[in-house]
């Protein structure tokens, strides 16, 4: 048995989960927030109870030291020698990484180089990796990339209709994201269906504040809705999803905003927040719709219609589907959104059962038994995928 930490480092946060492997038992989990700001918050779960501490955490190295100290203080590990491996979520692996990889100096340099493609995320991921290297230099560390799963997409899916030299010189192409989540739920779907993954055509709907759809054929991603960045695809909480690119100079001209300001609007002030004017949270928007709010209704209609576009096009790409999977915050917990997405899909063999659909955050088949296409709710678990990859690549006994 070995203890493995799964880490997701943001620019001012550090999310962690400690596993006993290979049993995949979660020993503890927690979150460090507001790193580098006043009143940093450290939260850890001990014996099922959340402990919260407000303190000064100036950087990620201090956060890591505090985390490791809490593990020993609370008897979660007897000593740091019990930690056999560390897995780091890294947002962008570009074309260089089609799988998770053991972190070396060379790999770390490559991740830093790819920061151009993910300026908000990769630098923070690197800071997290370096912080652990300082404290646990001899413990194997593995990078798990959000983009890696989608590296199986064919050129017809990942190339944009732009001058080919842009792809050759600048790496401009579709990369896709949420790969670790799509991989987990499609593998789990095959187990639940009792069929080999290689024989299945699956539609994976990762619907949260960020949302993406993936077409997975024979266990391989053949297309996905996010693009060069996580801004593309379906309408999201605060992100616009796909728009006509000519809108950017038009908005700049009309508002006097810079490119950076317009892109910030597309990332942080658009999507459901932009359409409603008051919230990015679908629960708020559904409640408002029930009160008769027109913009809430329109926003929800837009959200569902954009998902339908991908379901239709990916079903055509795969010449039919065996199952549709719902995962992430909205996909796992909103029976209303699932119902609206599935309504009217009988033409493609989708027959959902409204009674069975009344589930929240648990695995369930929500189709009628006679439905040719199965519909499965599967809570995602990116952390366990990270831990599995550490076990697989870290030579951990």
Swiss-Prot record:
Checking PROSITE patterns in the record gives: ACETATE_KINASE_1, ACETATE_KINASE_2
SUPFAM superfamilies referenced in this protein's UniProt entry, alphabetically: Actin-like ATPase domain
Active-site residues, record numbering mapped to chain? 146
Q: What class of enzyme is it?
A: transferase
E.C. number: 2.7.2.1
Which co-factor is required? Answer: Mg(2+); Mn(2+)
Hey, which pathway is this one from?
Answer: Metabolic intermediate biosynthesis; acetyl-CoA biosynthesis; acetyl-CoA from acetate: step 1/2
The protein's assembly and partners? Homodimer.
Its name, as the record gives it, is Acetate kinase
Q: Which organism is it from?
A: Bacillus cereus (strain ZK / E33L)
């Amino acid at each position: 048995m070995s203890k493995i930490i799964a880490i997701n480092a943001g620019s001012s946060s550090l999310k962690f989960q400690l596993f006993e492997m290979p049993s995949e038992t979660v020993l503890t989990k927690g979150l460090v927030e507001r790193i580098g700001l006043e009143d940093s918050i450290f939260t850890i779960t001990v014996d099922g109870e959340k402990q919260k501490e407000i303190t000064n955490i100036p950087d990620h190295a201090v956060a890591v030291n505090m985390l490791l100290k809490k593990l020993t203080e609370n008897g979660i590990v007897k000593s740091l020698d019990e930690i056999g491996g560390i897995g780091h979520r890294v947002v962008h692996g570009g074309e260089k990484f089609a799988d998770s990889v053991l972190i070396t100096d060379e790999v770390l340099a490559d991740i830093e180089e790819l920061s151009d493609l993910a300026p908000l995320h990769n630098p923070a991921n690197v800071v997290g990796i370096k912080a652990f290297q300082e404290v646990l230099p001899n413990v194997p560390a593995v990078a798990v990339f959000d983009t890696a799963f989608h590296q199986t997409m064919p050129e017809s899916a990942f190339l944009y209709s732009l001058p080919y030299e842009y792809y050759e010189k600048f790496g401009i192409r579709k990369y896709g994201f949420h790969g670790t989540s799509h991989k987990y739920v499609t593998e789990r779907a095959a187990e639940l269906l009792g069929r080999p993954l290689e024989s299945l055509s699956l539609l994976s709907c990762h619907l949260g504040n960020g949302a993406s759809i993936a077409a997975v054929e024979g266990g391989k991603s053949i297309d996905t809705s996010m693009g060069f960045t996580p801004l593309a695809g379906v309408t999201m909480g605060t992100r616009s999803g796909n728009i006509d690119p000519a809108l950017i100079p038009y908005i700049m001209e009309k508002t006097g905003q810079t490119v950076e300001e317009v892109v910030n609007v597309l990332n942080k002030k658009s999507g459901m927040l932009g359409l409603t004017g008051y919230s990015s949270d679908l629960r708020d928007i559904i409640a408002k719709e029930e009160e008769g709010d027109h913009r809430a209704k329109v926003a929800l209609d837009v959200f569902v219609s954009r998902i339908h576009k991908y379901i239709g096009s990916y079903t055509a790409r795969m010449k039919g589907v065996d199952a549709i999977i719902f995962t992430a915050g909205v996909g796992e917990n909103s029976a209303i959104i699932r119902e609206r997405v599935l309504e009217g899909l009988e033409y493609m063999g989708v027959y959902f059962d409204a009674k069975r659909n009344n589930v929240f955050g648990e695995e369930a088949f929500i189709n009628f038994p006679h439905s040719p296409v199965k519909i499965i709710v599967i809570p995602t678990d990116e952390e366990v995928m990270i831990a599995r990859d550490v076990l697989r690549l870290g030579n951990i006994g």
